[in-house]
Amino acid sequence: MDRKKDPSNNLTERRVSKVQRPNKKKVRNQVESLSRNLERNKEGQLLQTVSKGHLEADSGHSLGREKENGELGIRSIFYDKDWNPRGTAPSHYRNIPYNPATFKRRTEVQARLGNLENIKIPK
């Protein structure tokens, strides 16, 4: 018998015969596997959509510098109406937004100026 005509030795012929006469059990398993993958992909896409929505919502609230100059204005923890109205961070410090719950003062700050009482303190 010729090698090319013998289906057991011809790889192309074997592949074609598998497609033409598929095994029912293998087909069922492949369909189930594909349906599980499709469900998993849908869940992943949903999570990606939710994460993307959170990212877009959070993009307005920066935890670091805003723009190139690092100014946050009144939202900065370094903001002071008299001394630092632009809310610029000192050099080598990261500017973050002010959170009243996190940075709440427990006591009133008392100035200890000694004999320097003539210096004006911003209120």
From Swiss-Prot:
Comp. bias (Basic residues): 17-28
Location within or outside the cell: Cytoplasm
Basic and acidic residues compositional bias, start-end: 1-16
Pfam families: NpwBP (PF12622)
Main location: cytoplasm
Cytoplasm listed as a keyword: yes
Membrane-traversing stretches: none
Signal peptide start and end residues: none
Annotated Gene Ontology cellular component terms: cytoplasm
Region (Disordered): 1-42
Keyword flag Cytoplasm: yes
Alphabetically ordered keywords of this record: Cytoplasm
Stated family: Belongs to the AIM4 family.
Oligomer status and interactors: May interact with the nuclear pore complex.
UniProt-recorded name of the protein: Altered inheritance of mitochondria protein 4
